């Protein structure tokens, strides 16, 4: 039973009802909606289709909206495409002009104020490199260091530069408000660089009474440098290796990945490893050996989830990609000694009672060789706390709330279930244990460890452990 969660990006290759159904059957835990593309109406249609399917199939697939984020893009070129020659002069301007091989417009009008002579500007994920020679109020005069073809609306990156553009654009604000109304479980905040970025999003969520959890996407040196303060306020982080690999030296990406995963794991926060994990499966039915190793290594490092982007959004083999990723994850998990990792985890002196009870729950489950840890939770808080310790046995997290159950599907080792509301706590506890039995996780005579907060409904009040024998 796989513990690591799989996120699939929904796009032309995967948005049909038939393919969504197959992806859910294959093990998709979270469906990602990329707001860099598509209209609100298109996203709404796909979202409602997925929600209908997850209810019909009884699988609590979570939904994640991924913001466009603060970005800089080139405007249009004559003929749609030009060739930049190495060593040639090239000017970026804030004026609205049709682009040529000598001059092109940029979307961010304050870029000349932010860059300086000698700096580097990258275009199209770093394929084109420019060196800044001089700057005026409206123009940035550059030399082409690495040339190549450039076409309409390609992205622009400025490594090691603090940009003064606002974190939340008008488009992002409209998208977030739309996401609040529709009811996504998660939001991935693109290009997060500080804790304040996350707090700005929290204010919007609060104003719309949204319980969306926030995943901070780390895509720059600033984001890496501020990872501690970001983890303090975010619900999780994503190692977004695509833009991160453009903003920082390529050889540093694996180092940062391991560093971020470790910090998130210690704090009990969700951590997603993303970008090009099975990239060759965009066109091939099997991944490279290096890609298989990359996926496995992220799991050995302690990632909560692994993400497919183009592989499921527009690739030729979306279903095969999910099945392959699931097999790789299961093989890696089978090799990991989670019992030993739990035993060697540093003690948390001065922990709050919920943390202490969650830790003790995992200890009891390990000592009695329990088939499962079962928790009844109204908010998902208890499940998140237990998931932090990555116990050997599965965590069956039951809630009367469908959104909470779906939200818990991004937690490591958690099997979320929706149970009916009962008249009292004892009946809820029995319903949770029976849910584990009906799912085939535990059978008659097996021991399970039950934990919850009594009375139910008070977030952060986990205070009870009980051993149940399944009857």
Language model region names:
Residues 1-471:
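Non-catalytic helical/linker scaffolds that mediate oligomerization, partner binding
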């Amino acid at each position: 039973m796989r513990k690591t969660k799989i996120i699939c990006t929904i796009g032309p290759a995967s948005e049909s009802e038939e393919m969504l159904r197959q992806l859910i059957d294959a093990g998709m835990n979270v469906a990602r909606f990329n707001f860099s593309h598509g209209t609100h109406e298109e996203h709404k249609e796909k979202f409602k289709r997925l929600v209908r399917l997850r209810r019909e199939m009884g699988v609590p697939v979570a939904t994640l909206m991924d913001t466009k984020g603060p970005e800089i893009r080139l405007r249009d070129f004559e003929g749609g495409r030009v060739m930049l020659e190495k060593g040639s002069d090239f000017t970026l301007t804030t004026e609205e002009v049709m682009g040529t091989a000598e001059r092109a417009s940029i979307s961010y009008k304050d870029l000349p104020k932010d860059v300086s002579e000698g700096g580097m500007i990258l275009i199209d994920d770093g394929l084109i490199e420019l060196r800044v020679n001089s700057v005026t109020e409206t123009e940035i005069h550059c030399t082409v260091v690495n040339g190549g073809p450039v076409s309409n609306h390609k992205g622009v990156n400025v490594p090691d530069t603090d940009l003064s553009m606002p974190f939340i654009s008008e488009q992002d604000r409209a998208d977030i408000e739309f996401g609040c109304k529709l009811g996504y479980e998660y939001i991935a905040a693109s290009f997060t660089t500080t804790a304040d970025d996350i707090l700005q999003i929290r204010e919007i969520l609060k104003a719309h009474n949204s319980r969306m959890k926030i995943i901070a996407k780390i895509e720059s040196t600033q984001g890496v440098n501020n990872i501690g303060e970001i983890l303090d306020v975010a619900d999780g982080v994503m190692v977004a290796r695509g833009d991160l690999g453009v903003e920082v030296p390529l050889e540093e990406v694996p180092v940062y990945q391991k560093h971020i995963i470790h910090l998130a794991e210690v704090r009990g926060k969700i951590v997603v490893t993303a970008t090009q994990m099975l990239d060759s499966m965009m066109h091939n039915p099997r991944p490279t050996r290096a890609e298989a190793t990359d996926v496995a290594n992220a799991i050995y490092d302690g990632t909560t989830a692994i993400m497919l982007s183009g592989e499921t959004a527009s690739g030729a083999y979306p279903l095969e990609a999910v099945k392959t990723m699931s097999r790789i994850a299961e093989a890696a998990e089978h090799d990991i000694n989670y019992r030993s990792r739990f035993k060697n985890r540093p003690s948390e002196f001065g922990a709050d009672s919920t943390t202490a009870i969650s830790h003790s729950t995992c200890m009891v489950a390990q000592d009695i060789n329990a088939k499962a840890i079962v928790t009844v939770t109204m908010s998902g808080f208890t499940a998140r706390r237990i998931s932090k310790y990555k116990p050997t046995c599965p965590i069956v997290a039951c809630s009367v709330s469908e959104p909470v159950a779906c939200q818990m599907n991004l937690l490591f080792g958690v099997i979320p279930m929706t149970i009916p509301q009962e008249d009292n706590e004892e009946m809820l506890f029995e319903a949770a244990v029976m849910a584990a039995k009906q799912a085939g996780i535990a059978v008659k005579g097996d021991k399970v460890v039950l934990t919850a907060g009594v009375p139910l409904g008070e977030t952060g009040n986990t205070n009870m452990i009980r051993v149940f024998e399944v009857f």
